[in-house]
UniProtKB/Swiss-Prot annotation:
Keywords: Actin-binding, Endosome, Membrane, Protein transport, Transport. Component of the WASH complex. Acts as a nucleation-promoting factor at the surface of endosomes, where it recruits and activates the Arp2/3 complex to induce actin polymerization, playing a key role in the fission of tubules that serve as transport intermediates during endosome sorting. Residues 304-341 have a biased composition (Pro residues). Residues 1-54 are annotated as: Required for WASH complex assembly. Residues 359-481 are annotated as: VCA. It comes from Danio rerio (Zebrafish). This is WASH complex subunit 1.
Amino acid sequence: MVRMTQKRYLEGQVYSVPLIQPDLRREEAVHQITDALQYLEMISTDIFTRVSESVEKNRAHLQSVTDRIKLAQARVQKIKGSKKATKVFSSAKYPAPEKLQDYSSIFTGAVDPASQKRPRIKVQSKLRPLDDKAQQEKLMYLPVCVNTKKRSEDETEEGLGSLPRNVNSVSSLLLFNTTENLYKKYVFLDPLAGAVTKTHTTLETEKEDKPFDAPLSITKREQLERQTAENYFYVPDLGQVPEIDVPSYLPDLPGIADDLMYSADLGPGFAPSVPASNSIPELPSFGTDHDESSGSDSQFKLEAPPPPPPPPPPPPEPTHVPVPPPGTSAAPPPPPPPPPMTADNTDASSPAPPTGTVKGAPSEVVQPSNGRASLLESIRNAGGIGKANLRNVKERKMEKKKQKEQEQVGATVSGGDLMSDLFNKLAMRRKGISGKGPAGQGDSSEAPASSGGAFARMSDVIPPLPAPQQSAADDEDDWEA
């Protein structure tokens, strides 16, 4: 028996359905019908079995998820009634596999029963004689695909014709390196040069279209306003947090743990905040460097001038500086009222301790510079430029110290007076011109000796202005008289 089957395949279809051919003998047709029904029964049984297995598998997975949910609910219910604090640790990763399982069809691994060999059955009946008339009659009823679209005789194809079926992309539809569709309009075109040579019929039928006018933005040189793009970036903001005034401890509350206390300092929060200055790490300090730096800092602090300009530090050679001169320098001013007298005494006595502390500081600094000290000593022995008579540095510094104390006393006594302010301004200008301002006094002990320029000599020659103390005292006597 020769069995002819026709198979219809679809995408993803595993099984093939046999079709029974016409014009078969009765016995042969019965055998093919029986085989087709048995084949259909086997296919349906296999399909329903696979569907049932898939449903059962999904049901088991759903049951496992339900059991996990019930277990979690039971644990939550158990924790609810407890008054003890419970720590719950959550996994850092989402409980899912790194790679999701791909979908698999239920027909994977299925075998088509038609591919199996079947026993051959011998047909006893004879073949029918061929009838040409019956064959011709059957041909009359066969479906024939007829193109019902009528084509006019006047219509002429302008391009290459209809699109082929094997066109997969737009690049294969258009001419290379151009935008010309040759199936719609055929042109002679060099893709590299860009020159177009059209056919004679195309030139006759095509109408010349003038280009459109340029837009107003080009003809009138107008510029369109550029719209600023909106910013959709998320900026976290804490916003307004309501202040709730509640007591720190509420006893006997249901469902609240009573064996755990929280402190106010819980560490950095998740909200945006200004970085604190305490977050800067402290660098470790070394022993020797720290001692040296601390010593140098103390020296700088001692040498730094306070708001009232202090006297310059004395040279390292003299160590027996008499303390009484500050007291004697404060005595000459006229006797003011008792309260200013206490202020004067305190001002006069206050510079004494810094002088003692400042004495020792330069001696420590000058010790290592033996070469410079020997050079200065040789210059002093030589007599300077032209063997000029050098004044004693100690005397000059004592005179300047007395002069500054007199200025301070005058400023404190006649504070707020127009003449005293003018006197102070003139004194400051003289110091600025001579280069002996308060900024250059605390630099080093050798600064006054080295600043022997022309301006310094001129400022020494100019006598200082008289202090306005006597005039103020005379005015007071006149008012009392």
